[in-house]
A protein has these predicted regions:
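C-terminal substrate-recognition regions of SAM-dependent nucleic acid methyltransferases
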Residues: 1-163
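Short, amphipathic C-terminal "tail helix"
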Residues: 164-177
Length: 177
């Protein structure tokens, strides 16, 4: 897990609209654009990899439960950046991998209710940082992980499972990324 702003780009960085031939793809809170390679100050080890990025701001319902059903989403942004993609200080890299499939498995792991419940236990503000993942165990991302797999692996009983299921909202990752 990287620190916030793994590429040395501030939250105000918006990039440029088109690739001038010497650019990386940029993800900022304003969306996608391009940034000249020489402006990227750090994180060279992540650039050629598939990256799972996590937004530093929690979902609006992280600290307080949804009024309708009492659930929380916790993570607002969870996405995959392809090789030669970078991001601003609004995100950190939750994992960097040589192939898309492994990155997808990592992304789906972070989207599980199990992981988001453990993350919620360390949140005290609207910002997520890597130290907030203190209770989240690392996995082998060569395979997919579901909540059921994790409940079994860590020996959760029915009461513990019901607590997690009642508190954490399902997370829809949308398309492939």
């Amino acid at each position: 897990m990287s620190p916030l702003g793994p590429f040395g780009l501030g939250t105000a960085e918006r990039g440029i609209e088109r690739d001038l031939g010497n650019c990386y793809k940029l993800r900022s809170s304003a969306g996608n654009s391009f940034i000249k390679r020489n402006l990227v100050k750090s994180g060279a080890e992540y650039i050629p990899k598939w990256k799972v990025i996590i937004g530093k701001a929690t979902s609006a319902g992280a600290a307080t439960a949804n009024k309708k059903d009492g659930t929380r989403k916790v993570i607002a942004t969870l996405d995959i950046l392809e090789p030669n993609g970078v991001c601003t200080f609004s995100y950190f890299v939750g994992g960097a991998f040589d192939d898309y499939e492994t990155a997808k498995n990592c992304q789906e792991y972070y989207a599980t209710k199990f992981v988001r419940f453990l993350l919620l236990q360390c949140l005290s503000s609207i910002n997520i940082s890597r130290d907030r993942f203190a209770f989240v165990p690392l996995q082998d991302f060569s395979r997919k992980w579901t909540d059921e797999d994790l409940y079994e692996k860590y020996g959760l009983n029915e009461e513990e499972i019901n607590l997690i299921e009642s508190m954490i909202k399902p997370m829809d990752l949308g398309g492939d990324e």
